[in-house]
Amino acid sequence: LCVSSAEALEIISQNAARLAKLYRPRSNRYYFWLDDVADSKCHCPECQKLSASDAALMVYNAILRGLRLENPEALQCYLAYHDTLEVPKTVRPEKGIFLEYAPMIRDFDRALNDPESEKNRKQVASLPALLSFFGTENAQALDYWLDNSLFSGWKKPPKPFSLHKETLAKDVAYYESLGIDSVTCFACYLGEEYYNLYGQKPDIAGYARVLSGKAGA
């Protein structure tokens, strides 16, 4: 996708408007993302002047403009993930863009803000600056505590799953300390196939207890 193409951005806006006509969430928050691959940025002469984060924000701004043609209250996320974890340098978010932070490349046996984890240090390095840039209003953390597809290497059969409750609790507290009050996560490879394979349900209830503040219940 060449974000230096005005025509391409207009097509994105038009398609976003079509989607908004079909789908209007009660929260007015939309989570339309770029392709879920690393290093997918255009490298034409004009796009070379942009960081991956700047290029992504141009797309999300275009999506928001299209959404608001049908839903004037629409909000659209900026997904900080892989190449777009850094703060945009030259492009500003239009009103209605909010931060969605997804720290995928991390250690799950350590808290996200554990300074002893090199992976986690890299994932959180830009988070305070991202929150300063986008603001904390509507900011959301999208984590991977229940993503057994990730823990299984995206291969089936799924591996046995064990929830790192201590990590989860520390992560939630860290997000709250930064002003992020919306927390969610992927939950994959934990359905019927998992139950048939292992004869027990994964500890999704433990996740709910931590988020509700009833971890000891």
Q: Could you say what each language-model-derived stretch is?
A:
Residues L1-G216:
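Catalytic-core regions of glycoside hydrolase
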